[in-house]
């Protein structure tokens, strides 16, 4: 299965390594037409106001929204911001793939970034992981159909709704594979089971 990584900003290589560990084929997405040859998409970290400009200029908003109707999307850090319903910053145009509102750079400057242990309720069990937060966004509101998979300092930091998954931290920096596995294996399997059952 080919999984695309939006290659406008962020660390493409670390996400590629995670996908390869799961026997998934990573491919870089630089143009909207690239979405036609993948079965899932990662929106990696970066700078959300810059990502807004780059995505707008390339015509990604309509293309990703259409793609996300039937395919899983995983967003990390700024990727979560782009997937959110509202970013509380008028400079940022979001995709509205997750019914959450976020506050950007809630954890401060990059020098204050931290790695902390988290317990994640995912794939039917609770799992401990290390999570690296870098100028991380804070989820300040979750809609009724959003599942909270992990919290940090009382706020959700990993959420799932339908086929989509948003994280305020960077699992790829710690070699954590469970979120990529959940998004691109478990959720895809559930989607296929529903299609066959219909």
Specify the residue positions occupied by each region the protein language model found.
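Short coil/turn connectors at secondary-structure junctions
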Residues: 38, 69-71, 92-93, 128-129, ...
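Flexible, glycine-rich phosphate/dinucleotide-binding loops
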Residues: 12, 35, 82, 89, ...
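Residues that mark the start of a beta-strand
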Residues: 2-4, 94, 163
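Amide-donor transfer/coupling interface in amidating biosynthetic enzymes
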Residues: 104-198
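N-terminal beta1-alpha1 cap of cysteine-dependent amidohydrolase-like domains
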Residues: 1-57, 63-66, 72, 177-181, ...
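Redox-cofactor binding/interface segments in oxidoreductases and associated redox assembly factors
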Residues: 43, 75, 167
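A secondary-structure boundary/capping signal
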Residues: 8, 76-78, 98, 135, ...
């Amino acid at each position: 299965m080919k999984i695309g990584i939006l290659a406008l900003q962020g660390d493409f290589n670390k996400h590629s390594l995670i996908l390869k560990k799961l026997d998934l084929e990573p491919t870089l997405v630089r143009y909207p037409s690239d979405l036609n040859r993948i079965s899932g998409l990662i929106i990696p970290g970066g700078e959300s106001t810059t990502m807004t400009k780059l995505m707008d200029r390339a015509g990604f908003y309509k293309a990703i929204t259409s793609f996300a109707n039937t395919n899983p999307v995983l967003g990390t850090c700024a990727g979560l911001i782009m997937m959110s319903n509202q970013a509380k910053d008028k400079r940022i145009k979001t995709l509205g793939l997750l019914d959450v509102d976020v506050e950007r750079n809630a954890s401060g400057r990059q020098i204050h970034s931290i790695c902390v242990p988290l317990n994640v309720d995912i794939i039917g069990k609770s799992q401990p992981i290390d999570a690296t937060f870098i100028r991380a966004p804070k989820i300040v509101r979750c809609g009724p159909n959003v599942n909270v998979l992990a919290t940090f300092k009382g706020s959700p930091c990993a959420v799932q709704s339908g086929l989509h998954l948003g994280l305020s931290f960077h699992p790829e920096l710690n070699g954590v594979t469970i979120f990529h596995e959940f998004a691109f294996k478990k959720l895809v399997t559930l989607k296929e089971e529903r299609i066959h059952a219909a």
